[in-house]
Amino acid sequence: MKPKSRLSELLSQRVLLLDGATGTEIQKFGLEEEDFRRTLEIESNSELRGNNDLLVLTRPDVIERLHRSYLDAGADIITTCTFNAQAISQSDYGTEHLVDRINYEGARLARRVADEYGNRFVAGTMGPTTRLLSISDDAEHPERRAITYDELLEAYKRQALKLVEGGVDILLIETALDPINAKAGVSAARYAKETTGREEVLIMVSATVTDANARVLSGQS
């Protein structure tokens, strides 16, 4: 039975539980700069500690323990450690050349662990990136944008494709702050499904609401 069929069947019976936070849980491990570098070929001198997506390559044991802790607690769906694993966010660290490996290995790791528990699912996480299309990065020039839609779409396509190739059941556009960014994420997810022929992969979107009027950071409701 295809993942979509299993998910649909379970959703018709009960609420499925998604795992919890990744970043704050990783902080509890007390990792140092070396844990984020290890044998990676990185020319940048930027501090990498806190770039948690790198851990799927440098400390997969930590990410595996995190996945298992949520599955042991009863999660039906675990999320990959790929929240910032697209070229836009990784370029801030000089590690954009690693995004294909991060997404593929992150998906494979979560897939392997989920399969050990049986009837559990993997959501490939795609975060909002560090650039928003609805908001200028220059208060003096509100018409300016730090990135174009096409640039964002291409970065998301690259990420989504590797997540699907790595075996995720779901593509999760997570904590959306800007609906235009989310639109690019959904378009990229559809592209990845069509390109790989894995039409059973589901698409989910979660948004971060910042005030009582149900507005996201970019001001839309």
Language-model region placement:
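Domain-level signal for soluble alpha/beta catalytic cores
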Residues: 1-221
